[in-house]
């Protein structure tokens, strides 16, 4: 598969943090609010209750660590956790100094522009790659690893952690897996039509995930977290390339259209009915949710204008 290189050379090699407001006031980053997994939490709300820095003054820039394009950092317990293609690097949140560096087996046959984001929970760090791994957050030592039965590795979709469970994927193996957080034992697996590309979104007893196909329509699924039983599925005209964001009773997601505009979809979490659809530039963005509003980005270099949208939920 070919992928267009995403802009921003800095993101490919180093991590920069704007924290001047925290440092100047003496407030620790931990009390200001963590960001422990993709899009903040297992529901992918994507909006922090913390205040943003009041200026763009750079607090620190890490050394060249080979940071993965297309991956987000996780921030928890005073640490910044970074996917670096074949290494997971842990930085000190206040100084940017490397605390530890743990190697892992990256998927060799996929363009490295796409990378899964790590997740943190209860002193442990999780990452989906050729295998799904769990590390001790204190020193980076391996606690367990889970080899996907298909032999395939994750692409784009990282782990989601909730209620003692880790949800992970194997992309063109077409499966999502639910693992025990402490042992890595498989609890259940689910097969999707298309590639298992999303980071699963979890709200209460329900999980929303999707199947993506190049240039074709896709499908969104809702499962019970406890046992992986399907509750409903919804076919989409264009494929969902990103991940869903969940509110109390609604799932929001976007679609990517290679021939034109994509969409933002609002779907009932209860029964999978389409509540509304709004056309935007093609995107693999996961929506960010604040009360009453949805924020999404769209557009691709050379194909469509790039824009940020704010929609009424």
Residue ranges and their predicted role:
Residues 14-16, 26, 97, 191, ...:
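Detector for intrinsically disordered, low-structure N-terminal pre-sequences
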Residues 6-7, 31, 84, 94, ...:
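Intrinsic disorder/low-complexity segments enriched in polar/small residues
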Residues 1-32, 308:
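Secretory targeting signatures
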């Amino acid at each position: 598969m070919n992928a267009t290189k995403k802009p921003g050379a800095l993101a490919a090699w180093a991590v920069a943090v704007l924290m001047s407001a925290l440092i100047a006031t003496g407030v620790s980053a931990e009390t200001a609010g963590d960001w422990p997994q993709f899009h903040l939490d297992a529901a992918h709300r994507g909006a922090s209750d913390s205040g943003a820095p009041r200026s763009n003054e750079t607090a620190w820039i890490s050394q060249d660590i080979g940071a993965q394009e297309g991956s987000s950092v996780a921030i928890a317990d005073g640490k910044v956790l970074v996917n670096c293609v074949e290494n997971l690097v842990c930085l000190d949140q206040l100084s940017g100094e490397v605390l530890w560096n743990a190697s892992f087996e990256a998927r060799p046959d996929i363009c490295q522009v796409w990378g899964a984001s790590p997740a943190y929970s209860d002193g442990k760090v999780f990452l989906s790659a050729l295998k799904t791994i769990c590390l001790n957050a204190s020193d980076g030592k391996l606690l367990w690893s889970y080899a996907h039965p298909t032999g395939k590795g994750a692409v784009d979709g990282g782990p989601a952690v909730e209620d003692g469970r880790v949800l992970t994927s194997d992309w063109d193996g077409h499966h999502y897996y639910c693992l025990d957080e402490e042992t890595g034992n498989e609890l259940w697996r689910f097969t999707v039509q298309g590639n298992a590309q999303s980071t699963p979104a979890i709200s209460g007893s329900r999980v929303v995930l999707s199947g993506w196909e190049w240039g074709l329509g896709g499908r969104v699924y809702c499962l019970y977290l406890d046992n992986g039983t399907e509750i409903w599925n919804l076919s989409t005209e264009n494929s969902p390339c990103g991940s869903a964001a969940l509110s109390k009773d609604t799932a929001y997601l976007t679609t990517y259209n290679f021939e034109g505009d994509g969409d933002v979809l609002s779907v009932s979490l209860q029964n999978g009915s389409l509540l509304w659809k709004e056309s935007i530039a093609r995107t693999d963005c996961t929506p960010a949710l604040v009360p009453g509003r949805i924020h999404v980005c769209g557009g691709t270099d050379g194909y469509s204008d790039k824009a940020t949208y704010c929609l009424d939920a």
